[in-house]
Every structure is written in C-alpha cells, then in structure tokens.
C-alpha cells in the first residue's frame, strides 16, 4: 500500500459520519517519509454549519474507533477555521495545506 493509499473504507466511513467538504492526508504519509508503523493523519474539513459534536475529538474518535484500530487519526475542523488558519505559520491547518494532499472533495 503506497503512502497516499488509505486503508479500504476509510473515506466512506468519514463521509458517512461527518459529511466533510474535503479530507486531507498530512504528516509522514503525505510527505512520503513514513515508516511501516506510521499512522494516517487526516483532517476533515466540515461545513461551517457542522454541529459542535462533529468537532469534538473524543466524540469523533469514539465514533470512528474502527479506524483508530487501523491507525487512522481524523482531526475535524470547520471550513471557515481551516480557511482562516491555513495561512498562519504554526497552525496545524497551515501545515496541512502546505504539505498535505486532498484525498476526498465534493
């Protein structure tokens, strides 16, 4: 499985749960510097109207526990927050936008 090839069913499950506008792969897999035990770091860019529960990491990770077992970590963020912080050095969204790859978009 290549660096950008997610485990089967990952995007479908994220779309089912969060209905994101985009999903970005970032981190070592996006940079292609991953090792055999590296996880998949994903940022799910949600619509601005997304409910707060869809942004709560404990809730999201609990609902996606089957993905966590595959070492897939999903960080949710609202579109406006992603767009505002993607140009601010030091923000996670900036690193995602700079080195990441969109693996899902609608």
Predicted features by range, described:
Residues 1-22, 30-36, 47-106:
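Catalytic core of pol beta-like nucleotidyltransferases
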Residues 41-45:
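Short beta-strand->loop micro-motif that forms the acidic, two-metal-ion catalytic signature
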């Amino acid at each position: 499985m290549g660096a950008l090839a997610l485990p089967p069913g990952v995007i479908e499950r994220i779309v089912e749960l969060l209905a994101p506008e985009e999903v970005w792969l970032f981190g070592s897999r996006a940079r292609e510097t991953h090792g055999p035990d590296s996880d998949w770091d994903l940022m799910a860019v949600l619509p601005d109207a997304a409910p707060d529960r869809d942004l709560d990491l404990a809730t999201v990770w609990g609902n996606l526990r089957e993905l966590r077992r595959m070492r897939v970590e999903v960080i949710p963020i609202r579109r406006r927050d992603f767009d505002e912080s993607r140009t601010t050095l030091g923000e996670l969204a900036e690193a995602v936008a700079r080195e990441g790859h969109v693996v899902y978009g609608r």
